[in-house]
A protein has these predicted regions:
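A residue-level signal for conserved active-site and pocket-lining positions in enzyme catalytic cores
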Residues: 12, 55, 119, 161, ...
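Extended interfacial segments that mediate partner engagement and assembly in macromolecular machines
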Residues: 13-108, 121, 125-127, 140-141
Length: 377
């Protein structure tokens, strides 16, 4: 498929490469990073398009919407992005026409004036619900009632519309201040048979289809048993921990981001999962406290941010001595570094499993399970 803005956008580094070759390139990259491990072929998508369930666009003064040009804040207008689904395009098109009709004031970065900064759209794939977030510089949105009525009438799958008030002059899209204009301020999706609330701020995997495959692999590698205690670190809104909770005695989740932590609590309650608890703390500080208290942990799941984990976190794992550690990574280079640290405390990986969460980009998700060497003898 041909992308009309690929030379200016820069988001999809591999868009001109045949998809099968993209997967080969990603595997080869990981083989260089993990020369002593068995790097499995990348789990790709049957249809590697229209997979993004989260979209952020900006508008210019002509009411054209698009993505930012690479390494700039210049908007590249687009009619369609190959990674966005048809309903997302439908919503954006209707928003565009409403902005024109209501003469929406678009924020001008150079002049530091105007109202509308961004539009964020989140889609719940399984439940067919859409959340629209308008990012503006003020809590007053004149004509918001009519705007919401017309948008929902044209796009009935829009279940909620939120105004995020961001007065900061930075590149950060969302602020903590929100005002619900329509609906409940969130949507609900289903993942791995469970329900999850998705708000503007929620961490939620962008690729729903590949996410379920990834989590199934995590459960397979964990080999959890009903008498085990599992520590789920960097747990986000609790998706991985809740997906394996039914197979174990207890899950302990830890997440530093307060919004994600609150979502995790609500999600556990919504799914009636009573053997999982969450703590709003830094993963390294939390696991160090567990190590000092001699807490028994059978298995650890870790899904750190792109920067990877910390040496202090891994040293604490060495004190806790779990049977295994399942490491999910969105950056193979930092995972490769961390696996070397794990070796120093007696944990060894044999395999790396790859998942193409972002087709047409250079990114690849990696999963490994580490076992204590002494247990393998």
């Amino acid at each position: 498929m041909n992308c009309q803005i690929r030379k200016r956008c820069g988001s999809c580094q591999y868009i001109d490469i045949d998809y099968s070759q993209q997967l080969i390139k990603k595997k080869q990259y990981c083989q260089q990073l993990f020369p002593k491990l068995h790097v499995h072929s990348v789990e790709g998508m049957e249809n590697p398009y229209a997979y993004r369930n989260k979209v952020i666009v900006a508008f210019n003064q002509k009411y054209e919407y698009g993505l930012y040009e690479e390494s700039s804040h210049h908007i590249v207008p687009m009619q369609k992005c190959l990674l966005h689904d048809e309903q997302t395009h439908q919503v954006l098109s209707k928003i565009q026409s409403l902005f024109k009709r209501y003469h929406m004031s678009i924020y001008d970065e150079q002049k530091k004036r105007g109202f509308l900064k961004h539009v964020l759209i989140r889609r719940a794939v399984e439940t067919n619900q859409t959340l629209v977030v308008l990012v503006g510089t003020d809590s007053l949105f004149k004509g918001s009632k009519n705007f919401c009525q017309e948008l929902v009438k044209a796009c009935p799958h829009v279940q909620s519309i939120v105004l995020n008030i961001n007065k900061r002059q930075t590149s950060i899209v969302l602020s903590q201040q929100e005002k619900v204009l329509y609906g409940k301020g969130f949507i609900v999706d289903k993942l791995c048979g469970l329900s999850f609330k998705i708000s503007a701020q929620s961490f939620y995997q962008i690729n729903h289809y590949q996410c379920e495959k990834l989590y199934a692999k995590v459960a397979e590698l964990l080999k959890a048993q009903e008498n085990q205690i599992v520590l789920d670190t960097y747990c986000g809104i609790g998706t991985i921990g809740m997906s394996i909770a039914k197979n174990v005695k207890q899950v302990i989740g830890v997440e530093r981001n307060r919004d994600a932590y609150k979502d995790a609590l609500n999600n556990a309650k919504m799914n009636h999962i009573d053997n999982i608890s969450f703590y709003n703390e830094d993963a390294t500080a939390f696991i160090q406290k567990l190590a000092q208290s001699s807490q028994h942990i059978d298995s650890i799941i870790m899904d750190p941010p792109r920067a990877g984990s910390t040496k202090e976190f891994i040293d604490a794992v060495g004190i806790l001595k779990p049977q295994n550690v399942v490491y999910v990574s969105c950056d193979p280079s930092t995972q490769a570094r961390d696996l070397k640290w794990f070796q120093q405390i007696g944990y060894q990986a044999k395999d790396v499993y790859l998942y193409d969460m972002f087709p047409h980009t250079e990114h690849v998700e990696c999963v490994s399970v580490l076992h204590r060497k002494s247990l393998e003898k």
